[in-house]
Design a protein with these regions (language model features):
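Hydrophobic/aromatic beta-strand patches that form the interior of the parallel beta-sheet core
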Residues: 31, 64-66, 144
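Primarily recognizes the serine-hydrolase "nucleophile elbow" in alpha/beta-hydrolase
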Residues: 114-159
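Conserved alpha/beta-hydrolase
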Residues: 56-74
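A domain-start/cap signature at the N-terminus of enzymes
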Residues: 1-28
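Alpha/beta-hydrolase active-site loop signature
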Residues: 37, 70, 150
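Single conserved hydrophobic/aromatic residue that forms the stacking wall/gate
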Residues: 166-176
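Alpha/beta-hydrolase active-site loop
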Residues: 85-105
Length: 176
């Protein structure tokens, strides 16, 4: 089994600790996002680092397995659609600002310019991965969405409500 380095660090955006695990020592940084309700360790439990062991050992890629907050956003059925969308947007800001900066530090601390990150996700993680690439193309070089769920209406309500709420959440969080 491929060994990784575990991190548990504070997120100012989410106002809580977030966990992630890193495999490899350099190369193209790849941010891996879990499936619906999943955790950072799901990638390891399902054999992803072992499947990519050669690329990781040769320093061609470095894998960063992030945690999700689906239980507080998409899957938080007891919360209003607005609150779930706001949490979803906070998670996006965490991924694209805080975690992306940390990935750059860990991936190539000696480089002056930040490396472009690839993002991969499964299920709702696929949606997150594609969002990272489409909304932050200067940070993310590409995205792979595996078995993606892209209709957030099933979690957040009607398309109009989701769009409006998402845009309002984005306006609120743009100052972070």
């Amino acid at each position: 089994m491929m060994e990784g380095t575990y991190y548990k660090e504070w997120s100012a955006v989410l106002d809580r600790e977030m966990e992630f695990k890193v495999y490899g020592h350099g190369g193209v940084p790849v941010l891996a996002l879990p499936a619906r309700g999943g955790r950072f360790y799901d990638w390891e439990n399902n054999g992803m680092p072992d499947a990519a062991a050669r690329l990781l050992h040769e320093g061609k890629i470095q894998l960063f397995c992030a945690d999700s907050i689906d239980g507080e956003s998409l899957l938080a059925g007891n919360e209003s659609p607005r609150r779930r969308a706001e949490m979803q947007e906070k998670y996006f800001v965490y991924l694209t600002s805080e975690l992306a900066a940390r990935i750059a530090e860990l991936n190539a601390p000696e480089r002056k310019e930040k490396p472009l990150i690839w993002c991969v996700g499964v299920d709702t993680g696929a949606y997150q991965a594609v969002q990272c690439r489409l909304r932050r193309p200067r940070t993310f070089a590409g995205a792979m969405g595996l078995s993606g769920l892209y209709d957030m209406g099933r979690f957040l309500g009607s398309a109009e409500a989701v769009s409006y709420t998402h845009l309002r959440a984005h306006e609120t969080l743009s100052d972070l």
